[in-house]
Amino acid sequence: MSGQILSLLAGMVRVAIPISFAALAGMLSERAGVINMGLEGIMLIGSFFAVVGSYVTGSAWMGLLFAALSGILMGLVLVTLTVGFKCEHVLAGVGINIFASGITIVLLEMIWGTKGKSGMVAGLGMLRVPVISKIPVIGDIIGTISPLFYILVLCVFLLWFLLYRTPAGLRILVIGENPEMAGTMGVNVYKMQYLCVMASGMLAAIGGAYLSIGDINMFSKDMVSGRGYIALSMVILGNWKPLWVALGGLVYGFAQSLQFRLQGVNIPPQMVQMLPYILTLVVLLFARKKSSAPAASGKHYYQKGE
């Protein structure tokens, strides 16, 4: 296989990592009946606090922990608004996005004295797995890659196992389809929703951390650049199933990687920049008829007596 094709595929996987993390986050939240429209903002918060953590401690892994904790906190805010106070899910998510865009700029200026970008910090670097790197083609694509790729693969398996092989997963699936029925079965619907949305926030924030300490080792204003919204479309493309949702990120990753390699070709740059979004929309048009969202996603649940 030619070097250009291998480079294209390697770029596809790297670009897909943050999208897939965020898409898994959106899938888990919706499975519990809560639409996480705040993925964009939570990713931005995660990317910022990953840099802050790395800057303060000197360790990129501590930065990743900072990002995960910030995501859990933002997930708690979102689920409190949507489940606790019964706010509209979309409005609550948009509010999270606006808040994240503003607070990161304020904190950026407080810590680094600039509104544009932070200083360089320690990054996660690349992980080379000798066994995988020796496999033809596959080794060229994922033999040397961010350790977050392997964390992503682990998360896909764990979410699949949780949802389809455990009693807790069955409860989550029932809540997403019919929370009233889950309540009559003795399931603590609110507790499960809180846990799922907080875990969703953690996953989205880790995806955001990849953009900073997993790639350029710094934070830049609004660096998520719409990836949270793209991730929501990947949830639909993957039909709310962990493996297919994660693989859906490869669609955008391929288009984005192809865009990078078409720069300099005799094509209007505006058309090249539109390519990832056009391809995503086209794929969604074909996939939407086969997708089936959880029936109770975005709907408020009321316990008896409320």
Locations of regions flagged by a protein language model:
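Transmembrane helix-bundle core of multi-pass membrane transporters
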Residues: 101-165, 267-272, 291, 299-306
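Helix-loop-helix "hairpin" substructures at the membrane interface of multi-pass membrane proteins
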Residues: 141-219, 247
